[in-house]
């Protein structure tokens, strides 16, 4: 799956700090026109589809992805690579990190929920929680009312 590989590539790059824009104050059009997003593997893959299809759903998904990725910018790139590679190389998990994150982020209600999920993914990356705990927390967040945050 090309999209999940693009997400993993984005997570393993150092440019996540460039995504730290105030998503709440920026419209979807402004997000997609930003050159930084075009240079990020995952968003450039989606952006190509948006241009071809013009899908609002894809644009909203991109906004959730940008919100998720921008939350991870403080985690050192080597730490991100190490954790993702260890999960991907484990026999315990059948779905690679990138693909699983696509499923999780796609199900997120909005970009704010995606940001909350990213906070817990950060905890996974620094070793504060396990991958299974992250997956359980993500499922709980998915079923919560956004006003509960």
Predicted regions and their residues:
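Membrane-inserting effector segments that mediate pore formation, membrane fusion
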Residues: 4-67
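Eukaryotic partner-binding/assembly regions in large regulatory complexes
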Residues: 44-121
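Long, helix-rich, hydrophobic modules that act as membrane-proximal anchors or helical bundle/coiled-coil regulators
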Residues: 103, 107, 111-149
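Charged, low-complexity, helix/coiled-coil-prone segments
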Residues: 4-14, 89-101, 128-135
């Amino acid at each position: 799956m090309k999209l999940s590989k693009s997400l993993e590539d984005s997570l393993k790059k150092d440019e996540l700090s460039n995504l730290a824009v105030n998503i709440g104050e920026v419209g979807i059009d402004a997000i997609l026109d930003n050159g930084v997003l075009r240079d990020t593997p995952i968003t450039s893959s989606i952006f190509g589809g948006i241009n071809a299809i013009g899908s609002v759903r894809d644009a909203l998904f991109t906004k959730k992805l940008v919100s998720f990725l921008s939350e991870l910018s403080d985690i050192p790139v080597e730490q991100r690579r190490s954790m993702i590679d260890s999960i991907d190389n484990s026999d315990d998990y059948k779905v690679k990190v990138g693909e699983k994150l696509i499923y999780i982020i796609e199900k997120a209600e909005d970009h704010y929920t995606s940001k909350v999920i990213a906070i817990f993914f950060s905890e996974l990356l620094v070793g504060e929680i396990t991958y299974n705990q992250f997956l359980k927390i993500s499922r709980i967040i998915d079923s919560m009312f956004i006003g509960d945050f």
